[in-house]
Amino acid sequence: MEKKVGTDRVKRGMAQMQKGGVIMDVVNAEQAKIAEEAGAVAVMALERVPSDIRAAGGVARMADPRIVEEVMKAVSIPVMAKARIGHITEARVLEAMGVDYIDESEVLTPADDEFHLLKSDFTVPFVCGCRDIGEALRRIGEGAAMLRTKGEPGTGNIVEAVRHMRQVNGQIRQIAGMTDDELMVAAKNFGAPYELIKEIKTLGKLPVVNFAAGGVATPADAALMMELGADGVFVGSGIFKSDNPAKFASAIVQATTYYTDYELIGKLSKELGSPMKGIEMSRLNPEDRMQDRSF
């Protein structure tokens, strides 16, 4: 029996439909409804938001399928869910459940410290994190239909997401300016598939959307990432760790859409209550850096 898999064109097209929007982490149906009402283009169903995963320690795994099912029943927008890096069975279970996207996520404890999933082997589209063009193109080479910056999840600190977005976009400009005879060396240096390096040279951009994620905690953070070239924004702990989640969620969505309307962003930021406290990066131990969990 021939195995059914989705084509890159279809998967990437589905991801393109989320462009310009906000995707919010939720842990129950009530939060999912708040996200949908605020204007989120999709939700990420998980058992704990990244800040709680970070605080709890231990091994973080795929969410209880009951949570994912409850979220899927509660909203009409697409539902994503996270699987551990390299965990084929978690990903197959989520695919069988009918989720719209799977995030092969460094927020969860990796199941395989050497190999990522062969995402082209699945029908469902995948989202993956990246810090630079090498990671981005390796994930696309495996079949990812959508990328996001890794940032540093659960910190409420935007600095790493900014670093990763600037790094990827700077390296795209570098490749776009190369002559054809320099591309093979670029593929070697970046550890990236040659055909995808050539595609970057031709397009002048990634062949898939690249969202900002990891540390978005305020409307201004979301707008900043759009200014830097993000195709949209993931918000993890920032919304439901704030004092007023519904108001905060709506403000993030509007700031993402109207990211150059600074007067509006100022108004949206008024009287939101306190955002999540956040963590200064220098206070993180090297072993606690989630962004270093994949390669």
From Swiss-Prot:
Top-tier EC class: lyase
Pathway recorded for this protein: Cofactor biosynthesis; pyridoxal 5'-phosphate biosynthesis
HAMAP family assigned: PdxS
Assembly: In the presence of PdxT, forms a dodecamer of heterodimers.
Protein name, entry field: Pyridoxal 5'-phosphate synthase subunit PdxS
Keywords annotated in UniProt: Lyase, Pyridoxal phosphate, Schiff base
PANTHER family, sorted: PYRIDOXAL 5'-PHOSPHATE SYNTHASE SUBUNIT SNZ1-RELATED
One of the protein's GO biological processes: pyridoxine biosynthetic process
One Pfam family cited in the UniProt record for this chain: SOR_SNZ
Biological function: Catalyzes the formation of pyridoxal 5'-phosphate from ribose 5-phosphate (RBP), glyceraldehyde 3-phosphate (G3P) and ammonia. The ammonia is provided by the PdxT subunit. Can also use ribulose 5-phosphate and dihydroxyacetone phosphate as substrates, resulting from enzyme-catalyzed isomerization of RBP and G3P, respectively.
InterPro entries in the record: Aldolase_TIM, PdxS/SNZ, PdxS/SNZ_N, RibuloseP-bd_barrel
Gene name of this polypeptide: pdxS
